[in-house]
């Protein structure tokens, strides 16, 4: 029988995704066929499987930690917020509809059977399933139709480990309060607690751990220290962390505009890992002053975010920075914003709107979403700071619902290989100061990233770095460091025992 364990949290951003990835790595190292699973994920960071299905980035990097190819069954329901009240509902990797929160809450019971079937299908192929919940299981207003926390644990008939974040304070109240709000049968599923993100002398916690174990009857399986590992963050709230504030001195500073509906900020993890690059996420015009490159990232609501750029003063500041000779790059929604015109009768219903005008392009939104992995080749001749990237192979993925047409004065940035055909993508101006593409994950291509960074170095009179940084090897090292730390600070043998003793037939 397949064994399973589920990580649930006392709140969002307590570290469930990273610890789930660590368990996947540990079980993989121990020779077990392991897969991650999250029944419902709400995130703007998504990726594309090899068969063109869209799923949450967290389950993609957890699958990588487990040494397996990402499979959309690992995240059958993906919710992508389009506004404060609505989200795009993606089922088994394809867009189903848009719903508001109330409509989706009413819709959830219809998903239970499909989710259970998908879970059972996955479980038949693996020795261990590492499940992840969402937010907190103590959301008592959502309990009756829950499909992602205790509702999912019940479907999988698996034990639960509760993760609590001590860094934000009040960890013992969070543990006690969460368990107190659960029904008895739900509480009985919780077989252990992990205290996460601790800084300092763990001996200071011992008396508190003894008391919380006595009060709840649930053992604390370990205290994880705050780890300096470079792994993907799932939630936009993570952009508030020190990791993204870019205070460390580096040769090259890249400013990424933190749009209100930013999506796929994981595009920039490989860029941030470069030894000579400082990444800063910015929301204020004055923060553009020292940038060597400005990037407009993807957006789940392009025209709304374009309006925010204008209202906040960021658009004027960005155009002024561009006039001063600083290159500006756009990815997906950011690429669309850089153009002259956006015609949207689909996403926002705002019709025809002017873009920023840095690229002479016209974008028209469409109903059908393009979701595919692609190989590409950069154009044979590229100007200025992009010149060293000319002709290089790159790989990435597309997630968009629009088509962009180049007008006079723009050149194609790259050629994609799709279904045996060559397809033009992206645009670049003759001076290289404006560059856009639909390709997410572009910076995961090591040679391209080093060429781009060296081009920026040359603009500052700095010598190029001859060594190319391998991001795939870097990620593998981070997974191993995480697994090593978890083995040191968490009772992994106890987790094995919990899985063996408390897994029930589904």
Swiss-Prot record:
HAMAP family: CobQ (MF_00028)
Keyword match Lyase: no
Gene name tied to this protein: cobQ
InterPro entries named among the record's database cross-references: Class_I_gatase-like, CobQ/CobB/MinD/ParA_Nub-bd_dom, CobQ_GATase1, CobQ_N, CobQ_synth, GATase_3, P-loop_NTPase
The family this protein is said to belong to: Belongs to the CobB/CobQ family. CobQ subfamily.
Keywords: Cobalamin biosynthesis, Glutamine amidotransferase
Active-site annotation: 332 (nucleophile), 440
Name under which the protein is recorded: Cobyric acid synthase
């Amino acid at each position: 029988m397949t064994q399973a364990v589920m990580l649930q949290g006392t709140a969002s951003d307590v570290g469930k995704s990273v610890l789930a990835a660590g368990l996947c790595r540990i079980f993989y190292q121990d020779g077990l066929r392991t897969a991650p699973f999250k029944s419902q994920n709400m995130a703007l960071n998504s990726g594309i499987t090899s068969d063109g299905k869209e799923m949450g980035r967290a389950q993609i990097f957890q699958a990588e930690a487990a040494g397996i190819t990402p499979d959309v069954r690992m995240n059958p329901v993906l919710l992508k917020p389009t506004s404060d009240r609505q989200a795009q509902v993606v089922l088994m990797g394809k867009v189903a509809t848009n719903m508001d929160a109330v409509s989706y809450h009413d819709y959830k019971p219809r998903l239970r059977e499909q989710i259970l079937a998908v879970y059972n299908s996955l479980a038949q192929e693996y020795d261990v399933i590492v499940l992840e919940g969402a937010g907190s299981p103590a959301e008592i207003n959502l309990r009756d139709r829950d499909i992602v926390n205790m509702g999912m644990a019940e479907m999988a008939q698996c034990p639960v480990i509760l993760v609590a974040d001590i860094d934000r304070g009040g960890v013992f109240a969070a543990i006690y309060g969460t368990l107190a709000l659960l029904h008895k049968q739900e509480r009985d599923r919780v077989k252990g607690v992990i205290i996460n993100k601790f800084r300092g002398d763990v001996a200071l916690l011992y008396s508190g751990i003894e008391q919380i174990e006595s009060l709840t009857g649930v053992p604390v399986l370990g205290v994880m220290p705050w780890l300096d590992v470079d792994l993907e963050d799932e939630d936009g709230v993570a952009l508030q962390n020190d990791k993204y504030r870019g205070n460390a001195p580096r040769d090259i500073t890249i400013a990424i505009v933190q749009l209100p509906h930013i999506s796929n900020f994981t595009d920039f993890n490989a860029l941030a890992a470069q030894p000579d690059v400082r990444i800063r996420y910015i929301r204020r015009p004055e923060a553009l002053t020292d940038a060597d490159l400005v990037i407009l990232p993807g957006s789940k609501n392009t025209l709304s975010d374009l309006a925010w750029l204008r209202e906040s003063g960021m658009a004027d500041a960005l155009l002024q920075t561009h006039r001063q000779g600083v290159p500006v790059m756009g990815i997906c929604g950011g690429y669309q914003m850089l153009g002259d015109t956006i015609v949207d009768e689909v996403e926002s219903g705002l019709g025809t709107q002017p873009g920023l005008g840095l690229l002479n392009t016209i974008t028209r939104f469409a109903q059908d979403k393009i979701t595919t992995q692609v190989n590409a080749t950069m154009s044979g001749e590229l100007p200025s700071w992009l010149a060293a990237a000319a002709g290089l192979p790159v790989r990435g993925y597309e997630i968009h619902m629009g088509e962009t047409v180049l007008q006079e004065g723009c050149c194609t940035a790259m050629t994609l290989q799709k279904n045996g055909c060559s397809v033009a993508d992206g645009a670049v101006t003759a001076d290289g100061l404006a560059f856009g593409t639909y390709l997410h994950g572009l910076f995961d291509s090591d040679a391209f990233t080093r060429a781009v960074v060296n081009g920026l170095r040359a603009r500052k009179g700095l010598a190029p770095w001859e060594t190319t940084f391998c991001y795939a090897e870097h990620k593998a090292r981070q997974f191993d460091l995480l697994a090593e730390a978890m083995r040191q600070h968490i009772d992994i043998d106890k987790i094995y025992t919990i899985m063996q003793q408390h897994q029930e037939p589904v």
